[in-house]
Amino acid sequence: MNSIEFPLLDRTTQNSVISTTLNDLSNWSRLSSLWPLLYGTSCCFIEFASLIGSRFDFDRYGLVPRSSPRQADLILTAGTVTMKMAPSLVRLYEQMPEPKYVIAMGACTITGGMFSTDSYSTVRGVDKLIPVDVYLPGCPPKPEAVIDAITKLRKKISREIYEDRIRSQQGNRCFTTNHKFLFVRSTHTGNYDQELLYQPSSTSEIPTETFFKYKSSVSSRELVN
């Protein structure tokens, strides 16, 4: 049977049909409707107030802020992350459905910022707790920089393969008192591993006998005052 050609129909079909893969279609749907969970602990979070306004209007990127981690696929960490807040941050991240993404916003979130040298309670980088997709430096970053970070994340999502992303993620994370990143057996929960707690060699120790000698020399009246 001879095939019948329809030149006009063939030209119309070529101009109106888009061919793609299922992976590209999934990436396009995810990058066009990111629902962020705003996690702010310091001054960097104030910059989000400008994004909501009409001048920047981040709704045009499909961003719909959510108050529940179970409805979000993007978390923006802004501000200082302390040791006490680390378990809560990890818990929020684990409650987010896959696939999920993280933007670290500000110097304090990325490296600890000005608290990274002499603070005993600051996490030196949120990537010791959860995997980070985009680092956004600044103190604080401007709204234009936040939009640029979201644009770069959208480009990253458009080129990724979901199965490869799941295989490349690290599941076991831990950090010690001197903020060294280590891999451990158990899944990281944001708490310190008790087996890894030790006193850094650079910290000076007070002998026990000196402490009790000083304590006995102080009168009760001085302690009250």
Curated annotation (Swiss-Prot):
Annotated NCBIfam families: nuoB_fam (TIGR01957), PRK06411.1 (NF005012)
Entry's family note: Belongs to the complex I 20 kDa subunit family.
Name of the gene: ndhK
Topology of the protein relative to the lipid bilayer: Peripheral membrane protein
UniProt-listed PROSITE patterns: COMPLEX1_20K
Name of the protein this chain belongs to: NAD(P)H-quinone oxidoreductase subunit K, chloroplastic
EC numbers on record: 7.1.1.-
Cofactor: [4Fe-4S] cluster
GO biological process: aerobic respiration; electron transport coupled proton transport; photosynthesis, light reaction
GO cellular component: chloroplast thylakoid membrane; respiratory chain complex I
Species of origin: Carica papaya
Subunit relationships: NDH is composed of at least 16 different subunits, 5 of which are encoded in the nucleus.
